[in-house]
Amino acid sequence: MIQQESRLRVADNTGAKEILCIRVLGGSSRRYAGIGDIIVATVKDAIPGGNIKKGEVVKAVIVRTTKERRRPDGSYIKFDENAAVLIKPDNDPRGTRIFGPVGRELREKKFMKIVSLAPEVL
């Protein structure tokens, strides 16, 4: 569960390393975001010479959360860290590589480009 002021690692090669959530999209009173949800975030840490600069406001989709999530078959999925992938306005990833596994929920929410770039889908 990601909320305002949550910090997430960036799981792609855009140049950003850490982002801070400033808004959960999907309704005026929506408080939490899970795997496959879109957030607005600001870049808190970036590598020098990257495409993304510190302080930039970006949109991102969450790919991993430490809070367990129950699936329709009764199983639970959780990860060791909170991570997100930066996206363009048309919901395609801004980077060309994805690092680490991503949740299967991304396939159900039509983020097929991220699913195809990911090394593992859990």
UniProtKB/Swiss-Prot annotation:
GO terms for cellular component: cytosolic large ribosomal subunit. SMART domains: Ribosomal_L14. GO terms for biological process: translation. Keywords: Ribonucleoprotein, Ribosomal protein, RNA-binding, rRNA-binding. InterPro entries: Ribosomal_uL14 (IPR000218), Ribosomal_uL14_bac-type (IPR005745), Ribosomal_uL14_CS (IPR019972), Ribosomal_uL14_sf (IPR036853). PROSITE patterns: RIBOSOMAL_L14 (PS00049). Signal peptide: none annotated. GO terms for molecular function: large ribosomal subunit rRNA binding; structural constituent of ribosome. Belongs to the universal ribosomal protein uL14 family. Binds to 23S rRNA. Forms part of two intersubunit bridges in the 70S ribosome. Part of the 50S ribosomal subunit. Forms a cluster with proteins L3 and L19. In the 70S ribosome, L14 and L19 interact and together make contacts with the 16S rRNA in bridges B5 and B8. NCBIfam families: rplN_bact (TIGR01067). This is Large ribosomal subunit protein uL14. It comes from Rhodococcus opacus (strain B4).
